[in-house]
């Protein structure tokens, strides 16, 4: 055939292909128009975390036997355990325990391998501060239980996100 006719046929095929792609994109856009928004208004609305959420670590001073298993299983050797050997009873006495949450990767190994269950993960995830040194928690700060989001009347809790159907 003539070169002009073949170029015109290619142009027609490309136009049809482009229109099909635009139509497919428009259909995807229309399918998303019926969904609820996923964004929540953070300080006023908060999600209820799942049962297995790994938040701030809670520490119970009385249960700790200063075995330092948490330090050995931590990938970054983060917990600082200070203890003194009591010679009369031949046992370790815990003096100080601290974790720097600015460095912690929240892997949960310390909680999982603790033989006395003195460590546990809480649902607290709001650890932001203006000074990074405030993220170094000692045994007193680690022993504080977090305030439950459900009990706070100023915050609207969202129990689950709307399910996205494909």
Curated annotation (Swiss-Prot):
Ranges of residues in domain 4Fe-4S ferredoxin-type: 55-84, 95-124
Protein's name in the database: NAD(P)H-quinone oxidoreductase subunit I, chloroplastic
Binding site for [4Fe-4S] cluster 1: 64, 67, 70, 114
Record EC number: 7.1.1.-
Molecular function terms, GO-annotated: 4 iron, 4 sulfur cluster binding; iron ion binding; NADH dehydrogenase (ubiquinone) activity; quinone binding
Residues reported in the UniProt entry to bind [4Fe-4S] cluster 2: 74, 104, 107, 110
Family the entry assigns: Belongs to the complex I 23 kDa subunit family.
Compartment annotation: Plastid, Chloroplast thylakoid membrane
Cofactor note: Binds 2 [4Fe-4S] clusters per subunit.
EC class of the enzyme, as a word: translocase
UniProt superkingdom: Eukaryota
Gene Ontology cellular-component terms listed: chloroplast thylakoid membrane
UniProt-listed NCBIfam families: ndhI (TIGR00403), NuoI (TIGR01971), PRK05888.1-3 (NF004537)
Transmembrane segments: none
Organism per entry: Rensonia salvadorica
Pfam families given in the database record: Fer4
Keyword tags: 4Fe-4S, Chloroplast, Iron, Iron-sulfur, Membrane, Metal-binding, NAD, NADP, Plastid, Plastoquinone, Quinone, Repeat, Thylakoid, Translocase
Co-factor requirement: [4Fe-4S] cluster
Stated role: NDH shuttles electrons from NAD(P)H:plastoquinone, via FMN and iron-sulfur (Fe-S) centers, to quinones in the photosynthetic chain and possibly in a chloroplast respiratory chain. The immediate electron acceptor for the enzyme in this species is believed to be plastoquinone. Couples the redox reaction to proton translocation, and thus conserves the redox energy in a proton gradient.
PROSITE patterns: 4FE4S_FER_1, 4FE4S_FER_2
Reaction(s) this enzyme catalyzes, per UniProt: a plastoquinone + NADH + (n+1) H(+)(in) = a plastoquinol + NAD(+) + n H(+)(out); a plastoquinone + NADPH + (n+1) H(+)(in) = a plastoquinol + NADP(+) + n H(+)(out)
Assembly and interaction partners: NDH is composed of at least 16 different subunits, 5 of which are encoded in the nucleus.
Gene Ontology terms: biological process: photosynthesis, light reaction
Membrane topology field: Peripheral membrane protein
